[in-house]
């Protein structure tokens, strides 16, 4: 094929389609897709996780002994109850094998589920691993306004590979 053949072909094509008008669409009305409830909840979880949990914040947490933290204004007896295992966790979260970004979303979803289900205590199993989640999870928990306290879990709930977390569920009477 040379340039002359191309010009002839283009001229024939132009002659064939000359006078053709595009079809107007008058029968079908397209709607924008409606977001499902799950998509909306996922967006909210991502928003909560990003707004509550910063990777750069370094709270003052104990270096020696069991990992523990108590929000200012909360009775120290609550921390003792967590340590002894007086609170039975209603929800469990196993973070084994999760990346940090995934763990943040799961953590935000867990806290949201605790508030929604009126669960006062939950257990987060971060595992031993390389220690990344073991270090990050307490730092993230300190930043969330619904977390009242956490303590290294007793042996039956995972020992030093897990945390028992006390959640502020509002003005509900405490359950055990």
Curated annotation (Swiss-Prot):
Keyword rRNA-binding applies: yes
Coiled coil region boundaries: none
Enzyme nomenclature, EC number: 3.1.-.-
Entry annotated with the keyword Hydrolase: yes
Keywords from the UniProt entry: Endonuclease, Hydrolase, Nuclease, RNA-binding, rRNA-binding
Gene Ontology MF term list: RNA endonuclease activity; rRNA binding
HAMAP family tied to this protein: SmrB (MF_01042)
Similarity annotation: Belongs to the SmrB family.
Entry protein name: Ribosome rescue factor SmrB
Lineage: Bacteria, Pseudomonadati, Pseudomonadota, Gammaproteobacteria, Alteromonadales
Protein's gene: smrB
């Amino acid at each position: 094929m040379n340039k002359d053949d191309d010009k002839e072909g283009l001229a024939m094509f132009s002659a064939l389609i000359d006078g053709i008008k595009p079809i107007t669409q008058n029968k079908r009305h397209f709607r924008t897709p409606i977001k499902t409830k799950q998509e909306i909840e996922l967006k909210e979880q991502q928003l909560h996780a990003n707004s509550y949990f910063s990777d750069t914040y370094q709270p003052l947490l104990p270096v020696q002994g069991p990992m523990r933290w108590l929000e200012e204004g909360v009775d120290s007896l609550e921390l003792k109850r967590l340590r002894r295992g007086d609170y039975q966790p209603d929800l469990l979260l196993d973070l084994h094998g999760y990346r940090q970004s995934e763990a943040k979303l799961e953590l935000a979803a867990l806290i949201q589920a605790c508030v929604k289900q009126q669960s006062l205590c939950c257990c987060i199993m971060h595992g031993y691993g390389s220690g990344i989640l073991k270090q990050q999870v307490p730092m993230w928990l300190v930043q969330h306004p619904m977390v009242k306290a956490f303590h290294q879990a007793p042996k039956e709930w995972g020992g030093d590979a897990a945390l028992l977390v006390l959640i502020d569920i509002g003005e509900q009477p405490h359950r055990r």
